[in-house]
Amino acid sequence: MTLGSETKTDVEVPIINGKHEIPQEENDSGHSSINTPDSSEPDKQVDKFVKITIQPSCGDAFELHLSDNELVQELYQTLLDREATCHRTCFSLYLNGTAVDNYSEVRAIPGFVDGCTLNVVDEPYTIRDARLHLRQVRELLKFGLTEDQHEPPCTNDAQSYLTTINLQPEEKKEPKPSDILPPDHALPGCKERSLAHLLVPQPKELIALKDIAFSPYNPPPGPRKLRGDVLYIDITTVENRIYHVTCCTRGFYVNNSQDGRFDPTVSNSNKTVYQSVIELLQNVSPGFKKVYPQILKRRQEKTLVERLPTSYPVSSWVGNPLKTDGYMSDSLRAIELTEPFRVGFEDHMPGLLRDWNEELQTTFEMTRKSISERVIRDRSYYKIHADYVNAAARGVQSILDGNILAINPGEDKKTHMYIWNNIFFSLGFDVRDHYKELGGDAAAFAATSTDLQGVRAFATLDDPKLNTLGMAIFDYRGYRVTAQSIIPGILEREQEQSVVYGSIDFGKTVVSDEKYHELLEDAAHKLKMLPHTVISEKDGVKEELKLYTSYEAKGIIGNDGRKYVLDLLRSMPPDVHYLDDAEVSEAAKTLGYPRKFPHKLSALRRELIDAFCESRLVTFIQLTAKKIRDLITESKEKNDETLIKQAAEAETELSLLFMAISEDKEFEAKNKVVQDAIKEACAVVHSIYEDRYVMKFNPDCFSSNVKHAPTENLERQRRVVVDAADFLLTQKIPELVQNLKDCVVQPIDGDNLADIMHINGINIRYLGEIGKRLENSVSFARPLVLSDIVARSAKHVIRKINVQITADQLSASTSHILNCLFSVVLDPSPIAANVAKKANKKNGKKRVTSAWSSLTTSALWNSIREDSASYYGYPIEADSLEKFTELHDIQKTALFRRICKVMGVQLVARDYQLDNSTAKKTSIFVEDDIINFFPIIKHHEPFTADAKKMFIRGQQAMSIGASREAYECIGESLNLMTLVYGVMHPDMPQCLRALARLSHVLGETGDALNNQHKAAVMSERLIGLDAGNTIIEYINLAHFAFGALLIPGSLRPLYRARYLMNLVFGEKHPVMAQIDANIGLILFTVQEFDTALKYLQSADAITKTIGEPRKLKTGLISNLIARTHAARGDFRAALVAEKETFAIYSELYGPNHPRVNESSEYLRTLTQQAVTFQKKMLKLDNSTNITELFQAQPPTVTSLFDTLNIINGILIIGVPGLSSLGKQQNGTTEESKTTDVAAQLDNETLD
């Protein structure tokens, strides 16, 4: 198969980003029958797969299989990916002698048919083409270099550790002990927490070229332009020879220029004009000719998942230290990264700047009636949004580096606003006292997050007539910067002239517009916002106006005629628990609510509102149905025909009511009995209206700034909001806490915990409430929750310090702050104080000493305690971090990692010995440890709803055991994601993981391993090398590698996962117990009994320590420990372990279960073996065969693999492919039959 074919295949097969797991979609997101066809595809166009031939301008022709709906531009990318053509960039595609349009679909090309031939024709160079060509040359040569320390810490070039692990064994080679036995840092009980193992090992550098630069003789003078000169380049080869090269319209050639003398004519020694710089270098530099093929080989060894850039910027909190001797010069990089006016698209886009708002709105409004139209629309919108976020990230870093001038430079720095690359940037401070009554800067900071939540909510409505702004939030170096697209004409008008809906003076004056009413009515209904009437007063005249949203939301009609809605910070109802003057439930009062909070913009999450409304609807249906059932029962008991008739009529009308509710339609009951039942149920569930069920929220009902009309029943409206907040406090939080105690959910780090809280509709500010309910438990989640409270409180404190720090003090201040946290700093920083003192004396001016320089350990810890109490409502009693971590068994390295990640700090990966008592009195961190800062990015993340629906259908199929149907649904979901997102996206790892598990239970081991490998690589690159989701992917990968009998390949990911768990959390976690059980079982399989016993005992000890309920897997681990002891000859210990197994099975299943009987039988066998062993030991002589002393039969590999399936949460019947290994080890013949299997992919379902 040709390389081009491989490229297209790699894109189309299921390839595997978990900020994040795919959450369950809203009500209309696929909760239909699994086999229900999609009836909304009247004009679905069937895509065809065709075979074409491409004839490059260099090299042989090759065939390519592709879908006819692909863009011609993708064929260009295919040519740039091929080894033979990747170095040629200036060309066009021709069909039958006619140039092909780049941006058209393949099937739209005139004359295009299956089997046709496209010819590649080299085009004349322009300066734009020349610059793009040099960029491609630089990208190709980068594959031979190690990590580039010049790149910003927030880039699209993430690395993967898994690519350095060889899962496949070398042929005809037995695995060495070093391939099987664990490294020291992966042993149970290891105290080493070095970050050095976290980094990806770098291969040997392949340097093909020293430098390539634009010549100082540029641009070509007029006479030379007229002869075709485009650009002049200076190239320094590895032989230290400098070649002066002319780029002309025909290509590149060596010219006669020398140092100090300009002569761009063709060199007498080399008169050839080459189509690319690569071809030129291969002819003039022997070193380049030797190394370049090795670079290409290294590039081709990487799959698309490993080498393609990520859609959104990613960053790492650790990196290699700066090495001056390895700091290579790169003139092209120097130009690109030191010119702040460059936006990164000049060479690609026509015109000067991109109109982000126009691109975002145009793609958002594209038709979406059929699946093919939705795929094209989603792909276009996602691509432009990703480009927008990347551009905004670059702009934010340039702004805080001081490289971009504010549009209001004369005002205070906190009020500065910026426009760069058609993006509007503002800082998260309270300018002009806009949020003075709501909390000042704290409210301004929070308003951006709640506004983004509103944008996300409105974006899910898919109403093309209602537009929102492109928006992204960046937390960088202590600042919060908001990036927004610009509404056409907004900068040319006053705000009063622009706003046609909402209020610009905090609710005193409100304007409304019928056009917006029509658009907002449906949006408000879907978002459960209650339309309400307010009183607007202007010039002494009062007027009643209807609002469908909060008064804070503003409607603006842009010059492009589009209707925009912005300032959506009050799209969700307020959280009354954090409003001082609000009424709360009695249960909330007993818990200390309402309580003071830094701001008054706290809002409930949309997930909570959906769950609350669903709960109240269920209660309403149950109450009304009970009323009618009681009537039916009464009529039957009395045998009264009149009552029987009334009951039948009521039952019929109630059925119509329930049908109307399910279809989200209004229904007016006419039956008196049904009316009474509805009124009684509405009174219980606190419906907005007395006579019909309506559960909607007035976002302004607790606002003191706006006046409601007398017709509004504020008491009922407020009651519903209070009930929703009470539902959060009395049901959702206790439910989550119990799930954490029972290990039903197992978050690994703070990011996982935040995701789980958000999925359950719980805001992060309730961390303290969860912490209070866990602080006296032995749950694994206790140290995780409490350490996250400390980390987030530290972030709040340090943020206030960082905004006062100048750029030249960032390294010193950050290292000093970290020393104050993790070592003992009794006195202010002497270095900073001396520097400030000398500067003040020299300048003769009064200068305030930096806030960080006077910071000590006790002062910083007290500030953290104060923030924890005020923000999270969690009082920290410990008077130092040291005592706090000891009291709650928190690992310092895990806390250190979390603080660095939430601060956005990148440090040198080394062993900081935070748990070393001797290091506490000295400075652990120095300035050289601080590498850089990176922005933490939040943005609206577009998604493909069709793919999510198919994934949910696949999950439903899995839940009923329809494995093949589930595989098809999830595979289709992954194909849709690939069409929309490309090769990588955060939602893809979950799909690939599910496909891998389904392949595994269906007996397709190779597919399972392939899919899971892609999932793990994608998780590493998109979520993080040490992310919680990445650890889970490693465990699954090891499972499937063991299924393929790749023993070293299964152990290496597990050792990596154990090291990461030790770093990210510590040992006392159920996932660590799972990892140790996996390692112990695999080592037991290869008869490394001593090492296996360490891991199995560790797994058992962890399970008991964290109070995990006894389950099937607990008994299996005890049984494995018993068998390992027996294999080592320690029958007494084996009996003790097996007795525990018997007790667990008896407790779980009762006395007559097969597992109980099996354990009882094994106990008898062990007892007999122990007696026999003792007798033989007493008669031991020189003629005794040692192997005869051990009569216990080890379990088959098939049974061990069944055990591994249960430990990892997979129930599988029949394991094909393992019988051969079982025969080799046990000398037995077992039939392995492939049976129809049902997959239960949830740990708790198994137990």
UniProtKB/Swiss-Prot annotation:
Annotated signal sequence range: none
GO cellular component entries: cytoplasm
Regions that span the bilayer: none
Swiss-Prot/TrEMBL GO biological process terms: intracellular distribution of mitochondria; mitochondrion organization
SUPFAM superfamilies per the UniProt record, alphabetical: Hypothetical protein c14orf129, hspc210 (SSF103107), TPR-like (SSF48452)
Region (Disordered): 1-43, 1222-1247
Stored InterPro entries: CLU-central, CLU_dom, CLU_N, CLU_prot, GSKIP_dom, GSKIP_dom_sf, TPR-like_helical_dom_sf
Biased amino acid composition, Polar residues: 30-39
Main subcellular location of this protein, as a coarse class: cytoplasm
HAMAP family, per the entry: CLU
Family (UniProt): Belongs to the CLU family.
PANTHER family: CLUSTERED MITOCHONDRIA PROTEIN HOMOLOG (PTHR12601:SF6), EUKARYOTIC TRANSLATION INITIATION FACTOR 3 SUBUNIT EIF-3 (PTHR12601)
General function of this protein: mRNA-binding protein involved in proper cytoplasmic distribution of mitochondria.
Name the record gives this protein: Clustered mitochondria protein homolog
Species this protein is from: Caenorhabditis elegans
Taxonomic lineage: Eukaryota, Metazoa, Ecdysozoa, Nematoda, Chromadorea
